[in-house]
């Protein structure tokens, strides 16, 4: 579990979907991150950045890069997902 003064985060696998559980002062939010079939490794926290009323949690799982942006005043969230290109060579 990752903890910030105003936000706690836990990652769970719910029905084959990696899900972030965000616990804020007055409520909790579930945020679906991706299918465990396409993201087989549990996402791990790379960094957290707090600035001007928002907290950004940067996670990775294999080629997946995820940024969860939490607007602290309103408790709303935004998920930005990037999948890095494969480095495998396919000889055709």
Curated annotation (Swiss-Prot):
GO terms of biological process kind: positive regulation of protein phosphorylation; symbiont-mediated suppression of host gene expression; viral process
Free-text function comment from the UniProt entry: Inhibits host transcriptional machinery, by producing modifications to the phosphorylation state of the C-terminal domain (CTD) of RNA polymerase II. Inhibits phosphorylation at serine 2 in the heptapeptide repeat (YSPTSPS) of the CTD of RNA polymerase II, suggesting that the elongation step of transcription and/or 3'-end processing is prevented. Inhibition of host transcription machinery leads to shut off of host cell protein synthesis and inhibition of the host innate immune response. NSs also seems to be involved in the nuclear relocalization of host PABP1.
Top-rank taxon: Viruses
Keywords (A to Z) from UniProt: Eukaryotic host gene expression shutoff by virus, Eukaryotic host transcription shutoff by virus, Host gene expression shutoff by virus, Host-virus interaction, Inhibition of eukaryotic host transcription initiation by virus
InterPro entries linked to this entry: Bunya_NSs
Protein name as annotated: Non-structural protein NS-S
Family: Belongs to the orthobunyavirus NS-S protein family.
Any Pfam family matching the protein: Bunya_NS-S
Organism of this sequence: Bunyavirus La Crosse
